[in-house]
């Protein structure tokens, strides 16, 4: 994240608007991408209503299907979510967002008018001219949250929500483990309570603990189109890359993950334990996975 104060100072120094800086931030973010399969580095920079800028990169997981990847635009939106940003005004990207990402960003309130900044040809050296388009131009006749929920009062992606969850009785027996694991469970429950799951009513949270004891937390983030949905493990991986620089082209960095704690609802229509186990077995085979049940508060 680049603070609003720093963005404002940079813009003032150069006589630019904050939005004008986004393509430069994209080029810097692009260098940090982790694309071991495609070798195609993608960066994104999203401008929040607060004035802060949130960076994103594409992350590909070696040995796993392509649809296990994290897109740069998703990364930037999740980073904004984790920082408590409540709205995005603009996003710049290395290239025009794919359809997957256009659909994912459509979960934001006012998404149709959010400005998307994309390259539009060279103007000399490494500099490029840019197009600025509202998302609705890139996603005409869109399918979005209201098409499934029919309720404009429901909080959308980035907006505050609390899912009213608690641990299911007996899900954490007394003396069940080390204090670190109990702390991870509490954080995972908090993530599940903040999860964005308006379509399946299956909120979930997950915590990764690395070899330094650092906690990386994630929550499920759904899409009305279903497939662009991010699992809680994927959003936790975003946190791990963003805060600890985890992940590399060879996949060795992921082996720093030592444990994962997943909190999801008993009998939920959508479950994440199987997917999390598959991914962790591939990228962090020594990591343990603990699944804890939660339930709605009566």
Please name every model-derived segment:
Residues 1-298:
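Zinc-dependent deaminase catalytic domain
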